């Protein structure tokens, strides 16, 4: 597992939780991105990394898709 090179930003509230939940489920970042793309999210690895790192704003579609993949409510991503 790679160590995060940069500290977390403050552009969104969900990035850390997405990263934590994804890792708890043993899903690799590249596999998670593929699932998001399959579900209609136009996202690339750099953009996804910035999302988890809280370095960019998360769209409503991304939050919805992530919640579905992780089988959690959207509200859970904000806790």
Whereabouts are the PLM-identified features?
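Short polybasic/polar patches that bind polyanions
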Residues: 23, 37, 68
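A short, Lys/Arg-rich alpha-helix, primarily the initiator
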Residues: 1-25
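DNA major-groove recognition helix of helix-turn-helix/homeodomain DNA-binding modules
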Residues: 59-76
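Short, conserved catalytic or interaction motifs in soluble domains
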Residues: 53
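Short alpha-helical DNA-recognition segment
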Residues: 26-50
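Helix-turn-helix DNA-binding elements, focusing on the entry/boundary residues of the two helices
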Residues: 18, 29, 45, 60-63
């Amino acid at each position: 597992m790679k160590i995060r090179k940069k500290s977390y930003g403050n552009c969104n509230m969900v990035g850390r939780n997405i990263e934590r939940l994804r890792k708890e489920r043993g899903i690799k970042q590249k596999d998670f991105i593929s699932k998001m793309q399959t579900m209609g999210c136009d996202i690339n690895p750099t953009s996804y990394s910035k999302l988890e790192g809280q370095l960019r704003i998360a769209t409503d579609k991304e939050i919805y898709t992530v919640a579905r993949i992780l089988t959690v409510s959207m509200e859970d991503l904000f806790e």
